[in-house]
Amino acid sequence: MSKIKTLRLEATIHKLLSQAISTEINNSLIKTSVITAIKLSDDKSVAKIYIDCLIPNNIAKTLQAYKDATGVFRHVLSKHLTIRRIPQLVFYYDDSISKGAKIDQILAEIKQEKKENHE
């Protein structure tokens, strides 16, 4: 499969999983998290799904909730995708949003300090 088709498939999987979370999943831990990225392996047998938790204290529980809901997610994918094999879903915590927020906070503090020093 070409790179463009792989990217398109990743986007489709992202869309389908996001829809499944909003319509078919009732777990509050899953509903308070966001899928940030999906990366397919070269042979399309494994999909690495990166999630960010809106409640940072529940990272381990949220990852476990996603693992427990893997069957539901794979079923949704099998209904909508026309690929031969549905990839194995592996969930990872993505802390890039949290790191970005920390960087923004640091930059805001530096900007505030510069303002105070110039006054």
From Swiss-Prot:
GO terms for cellular component: cytosol. Its main location: cytoplasm. Gene3D superfamilies: 3.30.300.20. It holds the Pfam family RBFA. It is found in: Cytoplasm. Keywords: Cytoplasm, Ribosome biogenesis. InterPro entries: KH_dom-like_a/b, RbfA, RbfA_dom_sf, Ribosome-bd_factorA_CS. Monomer. Binds 30S ribosomal subunits, but not 50S ribosomal subunits or 70S ribosomes. The keyword Cytoplasm applies. It comes from the Bacteria. One of several proteins that assist in the late maturation steps of the functional core of the 30S ribosomal subunit. Associates with free 30S ribosomal subunits (but not with 30S subunits that are part of 70S ribosomes or polysomes). Required for efficient processing of 16S rRNA. May interact with the 5'-terminal helix region of 16S rRNA. This is Ribosome-binding factor A. The keyword Cytoplasm applies. PROSITE patterns: RBFA. Belongs to the RbfA family. GO terms for biological process: maturation of SSU-rRNA. One of its GO terms (molecular function) is ribosomal small subunit binding.
